[in-house]
C-alpha cells in the first residue's frame, strides 16, 4: 500500500500545493484591481517590499502545506519518507520552486480573470506531463521526454531520492533545476510585477 502511494503522492502533493501556494500572489492582482495597492504604498512600504512579502507568504504556505501532508500521510498510511534533515531540505527546495513558478505565472497576467485562466492551464499541463496525475512510467515515451523537463517531475525525483536513501549527488540535477526555477522565476516575477504595478500607479 505505502509503496503504491509513494508512486503517486509526491507528484500529487506538488500539484496540490501549487494551487494552495499561489493564493498570496493572487492577492497582488486583487489589490491592484480593487485599488487597495495605492493605500498600501502610501505607508512606508516600497513596491518591491510589498511583492517580496507576498512571495514570502507563498513560500511559508507551501512549506507548511508540504510538511503537513508528509506528517499526515506518514501517520495515516505508515509511509516512511526518509531521514528528517534531508526531507526538510527537499521541502524547502520544493517551496522555493513553487514560489518562483507561481510568482512568474501571476506576474504574466494583467487581471485576475487572466490569471484564473493561465494558472490552471499551466499547472495542469505540468501535472499531466510530470507524473502528478498518472505514474510517470506509464506515460507514452514521447510524453516522458517532455515530462522530464517539468518541475513536477523534478520534484518527484528529489522526494524519491530521499525516500530511497540515495546520496544527494545522485539527484543533484533535479535539485538544481528546482532551485533555478525558484530563483529565476522569482526574479523575473519581481521585474514584471514592478513594471505592471508601477505603470498602474502612474495612471
Label each residue range with its predicted role.
Residues 66-86, 93, 97, 107-116, ...:
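Short helix-loop junctions at transmembrane helix boundaries
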Residues 110-149, 153:
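Transmembrane helix segments
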Residues 136-176:
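Short hydrophobic, aromatic-rich alpha-helical segments embedded in or entering the lipid bilayer
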Residues 58, 91, 120-124, 153-154, ...:
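Residue-level recognition of pore/gate-forming positions within transmembrane alpha-helices
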Residues 1-42, 47-66, 79-84, 117, ...:
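Transmembrane helix-boundary elements of multi-pass transport/secretion proteins
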Residues 87-109, 127-130, 179-188:
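Hydrophobic alpha-helical transmembrane segments of polytopic membrane proteins
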Residues 38-42, 107-110, 148, 161:
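Short amphipathic alpha-helical coupling elements at transmembrane boundaries
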Amino acid at each position: 500500500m505505502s509503496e503504491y502511494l509513494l508512486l503517486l503522492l509526491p507528484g500529487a502533493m506538488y500539484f496540490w500545493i501549487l494551487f494552495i501556494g499561489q493564493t498570496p500572489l493572487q492577492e497582488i492582482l486583487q489589490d491592484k484591481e480593487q485599488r487597495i495597492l495605492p493605500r498600501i504604498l502610501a505607508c512606508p512600504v516600497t513596491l518591491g517590499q510589498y511583492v517580496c512579502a507576498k512571495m514570502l507568504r507563498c513560500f511559508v504556505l507551501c512549506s507548511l502545506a508540504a510538511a503537513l501532508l508528509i506528517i499526515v500521510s506518514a501517520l495515516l498510511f505508515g509511509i516512511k519518507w526518509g531521514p528528517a534533515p534531508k526531507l526538510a531540505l527537499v521541502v524547502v527546495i520544493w517551496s522555493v520552486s513553487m514560489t518562483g513558478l507561481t510568482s512568474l505565472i501571476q506576474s504574466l497576467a494583467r487581471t485576475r480573470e487572466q490569471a484564473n485562466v493561465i494558472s490552471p492551464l499551466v499547472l495542469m499541463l505540468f501535472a499531466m506531463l510530470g507524473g502528478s496525475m498518472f505514474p510517470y512510467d506509464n506515460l507514452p515515451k514521447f510524453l516522458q521526454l517532455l515530462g522530464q523537463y517539468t518541475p513536477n517531475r523534478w520534484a518527484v525525483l528529489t522526494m524519491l531520492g530521499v525516500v530511497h536513501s540515495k546520496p544527494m549527488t545522485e539527484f543533484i540535477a533535479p535539485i538544481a533545476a528546482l532551485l533555478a526555477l525558484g530563483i529565476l522565476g522569482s526574479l523575473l516575477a519581481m521585474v514584471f510585477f514592478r513594471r505592471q504595478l508601477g505603470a498602474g500607479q502612474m495612471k
